[in-house]
Amino acid sequence: MAKKKKLTKGQVRRVRSNQQKRLKKQEESIQWDENMLGASKQGLVITRFGQHADIEDLETGEVQRCNLRRGIESLVSGDRVLWREGLESMAGISGVVEAVEPRTSMLTRPDYYDGLKPVAANIDQMVIVSSVLPELSLNIIDRYLVAAETLNIAPLLVLNKVDLLEVDDRAMYEEWLKEYERIGYKVLFVSKNSGEGISDLEVQLRDRINIFVGQSGVGKSSLVNALMPELEQEVEEGAISENSGLGQHTTTAARLYHIPTGGDLIDSPGVREFGLWHLEAEEVTKAFVEFRPYLGGCKFRDCKHNDDPGCILREAVEKGEVSEVRFENYHRILESMMENKANRQYSRNKKADL
């Protein structure tokens, strides 16, 4: 038997594109006449599935699955919309989303091929979840903080699974995270198993639309279950691979939940690394809040804050006024941005050649 030829990446993308077109054509076969639709209402996007979205009626609280009008592309959890309910359900679809209201904020995630992909809208607070298992990464925390600062979304740092820490280890983690408190960020130590910090977390989430971000395996879904026990069966908890120690991807689509104690929560898919290549270096520099008092004071206007002579930011690091760890992470982020931009350009050129 002849060996089956493996598809190239370009062929795989074309197959997926054709599948999406067929699915979209099938979905568009569900058409609504004007006389089959009720009056326009305000709604809240709970989650989205392709050309469908689950919309909460802001008057009744009921959730209906709706089609999207042509031209509505970037609908995401947290969006406020205008929608019309069908007088009867058609193939499980109960209405149509007709317009998206202006957003106060938009969280996006870079994609190599498609540029920026929206993740969630109208976010008030970014809950950056880390964990003692698989391991705490201050570099990942700093990446999320850059995203939060550039989007003007208030960040909240949460260290999960602290029940696994011995006393000496806990003191070490507290020392690591004390720097973030020093520069003005709120830090919480929490555990679903012991209940530590859960009530404090509930207080911080009230009256806000919150999004949980963090690597896979840090326990975002387990915290959702701790905040809303009735969803224990609905939200699948991630397992840690015994072989690699890495978390398995669990949540497959961003979804908004109402927290019984107040506030809303959007649970988003975990990511291994939060891409920042779409930002300019100056934006990243300003996103490190403790750098701001020193910016503009270096000897040279184009100072890279590395080995440049007369760099007052590096002098501040040497004096202990700025964290050396944060300063090193800053340069790592800039280096990875340059690498990712180069890889993206290579991918785009390769895609154009296919």
Swiss-Prot record:
SUPFAM superfamilies from the UniProt entry: P-loop containing nucleoside triphosphate hydrolases
GO BP term (any one): ribosomal small subunit biogenesis
InterPro entries: G_CP_dom, NA-bd_OB-fold, P-loop_NTPase, Ribosome_biogen_GTPase_RsgA, RsgA_GTPase_dom
Necessary cofactors: Zn(2+)
Residues covered by region (Disordered): 1-28
The protein's Enzyme Commission number: 3.6.1.-
Positions of disulphide bridges: none
Stretches with biased composition (Basic residues): 1-24
Pfam families: RsgA_GTPase
GO MF annotation, one: rRNA binding
Residues that coordinate or bind Zn(2+): C298, C303, H305, C311
Residues noted as binding GTP in the record, renumbered to the chain: N160, K161, V162, D163, G214, Q215, S216, G217, V218, G219, K220, S221, S222
CP-type G domain: residues covered: 113-274
Function: One of several proteins that assist in the late maturation steps of the functional core of the 30S ribosomal subunit. Helps release RbfA from mature subunits. May play a role in the assembly of ribosomal proteins into the subunit. Circularly permuted GTPase that catalyzes slow GTP hydrolysis, GTPase activity is stimulated by the 30S ribosomal subunit.
Assembly: Monomer. Associates with 30S ribosomal subunit, binds 16S rRNA.
NCBIfam families according to UniProt: PRK12288.1, ribosome small subunit-dependent GTPase A
Similarity section: Belongs to the TRAFAC class YlqF/YawG GTPase family. RsgA subfamily.
Name by which UniProt lists this protein: Small ribosomal subunit biogenesis GTPase RsgA 1
GN (gene name): rsgA1
